[in-house]
Amino acid sequence: MSNVPAELKYTTSHEWVLHEGGGIYSVGITEHAQELLGDMVFIDLPEVGTVVAAGDDCAVAESVKAASDIYAPISGEIVEVNDDLESSPELVNSAPYADGWLFRIRISDESDLDELLDAEGYQASLEEDE
């Protein structure tokens, strides 16, 4: 069973969101997603300054198995990307909820958070998929 940290919010497309304070949220893919994709070989991240709407595809995770779009879980402006992934994309596999974060976004619409799942809801969605 995949690790689903309680302090995070989730999407049904397997992204997670962590509030960093001041309207800034870190975004990554879940342990379940990285298990499905396998070993990461490249992460195509959005440009800092890009404005995204919730649901927009804004990054791509390329693994030995497939390339998968990553969707913005909330609307806002990309304020930082994880440059470590350029040389070490495997961080998404080894630490998806820590060093393997993808980008940080300044939220523009707090109501987007209402659309996200809590850990229990995300775990239930995984069990439905099995």
UniProtKB/Swiss-Prot annotation:
Pfam families: GCV_H. PROSITE patterns: BIOTINYL_LIPOYL, LIPOYL. This is Glycine cleavage system H protein. The modification N6-lipoyllysine is found at residue 65. Binds 1 lipoyl cofactor covalently. Its cofactor is (R)-lipoate. The glycine cleavage system catalyzes the degradation of glycine. The H protein shuttles the methylamine group of glycine from the P protein to the T protein. The glycine cleavage system is composed of four proteins: P, T, L and H. InterPro entries: 2-oxoA_DH_lipoyl-BS, Biotin_lipoyl, GCV_H, GCV_H/Fam206, GCV_H_sub, Single_hybrid_motif. GO terms for cellular component: cytosol; glycine cleavage complex. One of its GO terms (biological process) is glycine decarboxylation via glycine cleavage system. Keywords: Lipoyl. It comes from the Bacteria. Residues 24-106 form the Lipoyl-binding domain. Belongs to the GcvH family. The keyword Cytoplasm does not apply.
